[in-house]
Amino acid sequence: MSEALLVKVGGSLRGAEALLEELAAYPGPLVLVHGGGPEIGEWLKRLGYESRFVGGLRVTPPEQLEVVEMALYLTGKRLAWGLSRRGRKALALSGRDALCLRGRALPELGRVGEVVGVEVGLLLDLLEKGYTPLLAPIALDEEGPLNVNADTAAGAVAGALGWPAVFLTDVEGVYRNPKDPKTRFPRLTPKEVEALKEEGVIQGGMIPKVEAALAALRAGAPWAAVAKGERGVLRRLLSGEGGTLFSPS
């Protein structure tokens, strides 16, 4: 059997046809965590709310949280439909379902939180029955739902499952020179990542992607990877032909 993978996908469905084909055809078990940034932003704007970010996290006042949940719900259902009609039965869930994700609030950001616990029982039950779980990054604390960064949620779920975490992005891994495909790093350790950050090789928008991969390792994932979300990505990644794989040592 092919390796079980936790895959974090973006929330945008624009241009996602090839990626959906790729995921639907993967022969091994998958758990997917999805974002929803574009859909959330569009709905907030439509309803007259302003989108604000602090440290890359969406500020989510209580009055906006229902909008965020609605947008994530719609995104998850569309992704699940896209996979199901390609032959991979997928079920869209929220992290609040069956207490999958337990969170701790970051009050300065409103109803935003970080994951402090993961219950994987429902995910494993669905996998055993032949379904692919598709999880929206909503956690629960004592006061209700929390908006959680999708990369953070994906790393936590991968760690709880003990599965590798694959973060699909718009770039093909880490490069010493982004303009030269021959300079891709096929594999990095946390120590090497810190050295590359000090050199300025890993900078800008790549930093949060790499940090998400390292967080997955700390949570218990055997390895993590950053790769471009396009047709053939999983085959290339698992064969060492694409992406950047992060291992504990």
Curated annotation (Swiss-Prot):
Q: Where in the cell is it found?
A: Cytoplasm
Kindly tell me the pathway this chain contributes to.
Answer: Amino-acid biosynthesis; L-arginine biosynthesis; N(2)-acetyl-L-ornithine from L-glutamate: step 2/4
SUPFAM superfamilies, sorted: Carbamate kinase-like
Transmembrane keyword on record = no
GO MF: acetylglutamate kinase activity; ATP binding
| Catalytic function, reaction form | N-acetyl-L-glutamate + ATP = N-acetyl-L-glutamyl 5-phosphate + ADP
Which residues lie in coiled coils? none
Annotated Pfam families? AA_kinase (PF00696)
E.C. number(s) listed in UniProt:
2.7.2.8
Record's GO cellular component terms:
cytoplasm
Q: Which UniProt keywords apply?
A: Amino-acid biosynthesis, Arginine biosynthesis, ATP-binding, Cytoplasm, Kinase, Nucleotide-binding, Transferase
Signal peptide residue numbers: none
InterPro entries, per this entry?
Answer: AceGlu_kinase-like_sf, AcgluKinase_fam, ArgB, Asp/Glu/Uridylate_kinase
What's an example Gene Ontology biological process for this entry? Answer: arginine biosynthetic process via ornithine
Positions of substrate binding: 36-37, 58, 147
What general EC class does the enzyme of this chain belong to? Answer: transferase
Q: Where is this site: Transition state stabilizer?
A: 8, 209
Transmembrane regions: none
The record ties this protein, via HAMAP family, to: ArgB
Which family does the record assign? Belongs to the acetylglutamate kinase family. ArgB subfamily.
Q: Which NCBIfam families match?
A: argB
Relate the protein's function as given in its record. Answer: Catalyzes the ATP-dependent phosphorylation of N-acetyl-L-glutamate.
Q: What is the protein name stated in its UniProt record? A: Acetylglutamate kinase
